[in-house]
Amino acid sequence: MVGISWMREGPFGVMVHWTSRIMPQSGTPEPDWNTRVDSFPVEEFADTLLRVGAKWLIFTCGHCGDAFCAPNSAIERYFPGHCSSRDLIAELGSALHCRGLKLIVYFQTEIDHESEAMRIAFGWDLDPRDKTVFQCRWMEVLRAYSEQWGFLVDGWWFDSCYDSKEKTFLRTHGAGWDNSRFNVSEWFGAARAGNALVLVAMNSGVAKDRHTCVFPEFEDYLAGESNDLSIRPGNTELQDGKQWHGLVWLDCFWGHFEKSGIIEPPRYSDDQLLDYLGECKRHKGAVTFNIGIYEDGTLAEATMAQLERLGRTLKKI
């Protein structure tokens, strides 16, 4: 696990859900996606992460909406007009690497909740269970991004790797599609087409009592989605020696999606987070904190102040 040592040794990472649904701090959202993406302050954003002590970033490229923050030849072929002109992911990767930080890209593996137009374009609705056409088209998208970004991206965090019968929130709950939809070797081949060393995790949803892999033979670290601080590496059996990783939201529930306004304050005290981080680090676990971000690319001030305090404290330990 030499290639993942940066995750094991770093104090923590930061995840943000910056998508077409993200709301501003005040006023109404900017309706033009290209204008939003063009306005994202990459250098200032990277400086903020460096200042608070984060060692990696997980950033969304498409999530709960049909807008993507980087151009993609396959998307343009099947679903034109939904990619930004600016390659925000490539610019983030470059800015982070210049500061010694790493970039992991969030990417969804199903589009059940997306617009009908998007589902038709990629063949999602052709059959309630058989997702072969969708998988072929979606792997073209993944491969195109992987080859486009190359070594600017250090990892993938793939979401929605689950059985539809287990998730009542799905539009097609009970339809019967599940992880058998993946041609596993081809999927991971597409993910690593541009960078054979890229790290990969597959997320099956919020864990109940332990984090696990979906395809242990192919994954490098645990996706680790959690809604609280209860799951820790000390009481979690590692699966096939994969890097333990916990991902917890700190303020708004995964994203500032509901309405314009100030993002909620941190829900944990400094001592609670230090206790969690301390135990995870003692067992060589990695931790990512999801924090709120506004439409203009600025981060929740109270949460960032808390992370900055944590970063200073961890340096003294």
Positions of PLM-derived features:
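Mature catalytic domains of secreted/periplasmic carbohydrate-active enzymes
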Residues: 1-317
